[in-house]
């Protein structure tokens, strides 16, 4: 999917870029049976307090229900009926129509087009877009939408342009190199989808103006040094100051280089190599 630029008729258009959406199917509304209403929480938790700052507003969205597991359709071929936009995630989504008449959305892999036939299951061919257990995928292949627990559905590598690589297979576990650089052992019966996630140009888009961030539900980010001392550890001072200490969060946690992962976490034994920092 290409990048669209604009003539600078206004200052806000000078650096703004958007995706061209050439790959999307024309005239396709989302399938009503696979969508549901989505209430914006504006960063509030169940008690009404702000738990995630700088969230709120934005365009109303309907949630598209994505089949991350594809386990109950083993051995049933499906035709790609449409490639659609999803406002809730960075990649596009593909509408699959199975031979038994059922319809499902999946994350659209790079290179999958309308009319392609996809399949899931241990006997599915090695083809981009097919979902297989990790033990059935050859070493060196790129995968995405990887399960961590059998039957829970894909949890890893679901963002636009992302992919992991099968590094080795030994016993009950397959070693996978994740986009972060981490090498992790995953149980061989877990499912993964072959290929890369599509819409790889998403990372090259320039928002260009503050208003578009508001359309996306992102509110302004105020610097700590611009606040009062009661609001932030960097606040206060006469005139413009640098904060006077190493960068920290509003609650005093160091912002740079501070390790937040729990010591002796249960999943440490599955990590062969830590991620690239």
Curated annotation (Swiss-Prot):
SMART domains: Ribosomal_L2, Ribosomal_L2_C. Disulfide bonds: none annotated. PANTHER family: LARGE RIBOSOMAL SUBUNIT PROTEIN UL2M (PTHR13691:SF5), RIBOSOMAL PROTEIN L2 (PTHR13691). Residues 32-58, 225-277 are annotated as: Disordered. One of its GO terms (molecular function) is transferase activity. The gene is rplB. Gene3D superfamilies: 2.30.30.30, Nucleic acid-binding proteins (2.40.50.140), Ribosomal protein L2, domain 3 (4.10.950.10). One of the primary rRNA binding proteins. Required for association of the 30S and 50S subunits to form the 70S ribosome, for tRNA binding and peptide bond formation. It has been suggested to have peptidyltransferase activity; this is somewhat controversial. Makes several contacts with the 16S rRNA in the 70S ribosome. This is Large ribosomal subunit protein uL2. GO terms for biological process: cytoplasmic translation. Keywords: Ribonucleoprotein, Ribosomal protein, RNA-binding, rRNA-binding. PROSITE patterns: RIBOSOMAL_L2 (PS00467). The keyword rRNA-binding applies. Belongs to the universal ribosomal protein uL2 family.
């Amino acid at each position: 999917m290409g990048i669209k630029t604009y003539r600078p008729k206004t200052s806000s258009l000078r650096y703004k870029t958007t995706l061209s959406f050439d790959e999307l199917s024309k005239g396709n509304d989302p399938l009503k049976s696979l969508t549901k209403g989505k209430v914006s929480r504006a960063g509030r938790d169940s008690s009404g307090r702000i738990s995630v700052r700088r969230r709120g507003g934005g365009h109303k969205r309907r949630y598209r229900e994505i089949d991350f597991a594809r386990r109950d359709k083993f051995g049933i071929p499906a035709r790609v009926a449409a490639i659609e936009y999803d406002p809730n995630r960075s990649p596009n989504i593909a509408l699959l129509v199975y031979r038994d008449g059922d319809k499902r959305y999946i994350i659209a892999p790079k290179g999958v087009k309308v009319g392609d036939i996809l399949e899931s299951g241990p006997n599915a061919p090695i083809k981009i877009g097919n979902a297989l257990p990790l033990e059935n995928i050859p070493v060196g292949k790129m995968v995405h939408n990887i399960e961590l627990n059998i039957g829970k559905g894909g949890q890893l590598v679901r963002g636009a342009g992302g992919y992991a690589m099968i590094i080795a297979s030994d016993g009950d576990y397959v070693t996978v190199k994740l986009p972060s650089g981490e090498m992790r052992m995953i149980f061989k019966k877990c499912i993964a989808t072959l290929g890369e996630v599509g819409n790889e140009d998403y990372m090259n888009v320039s928002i260009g103006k503050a208003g578009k961030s508001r359309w996306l539900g992102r509110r302004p980010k105020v610097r700590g040094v611009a606040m009062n001392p009661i609001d932030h550890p960097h606040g206060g001072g006469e005139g413009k100051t640098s904060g006077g200490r190493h960068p920290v969060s509003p609650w005093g946690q160091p912002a740079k280089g501070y390790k937040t992962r729990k010591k002796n976490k249960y999943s440490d034994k599955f990590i062969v190599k830590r991620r690239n920092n």
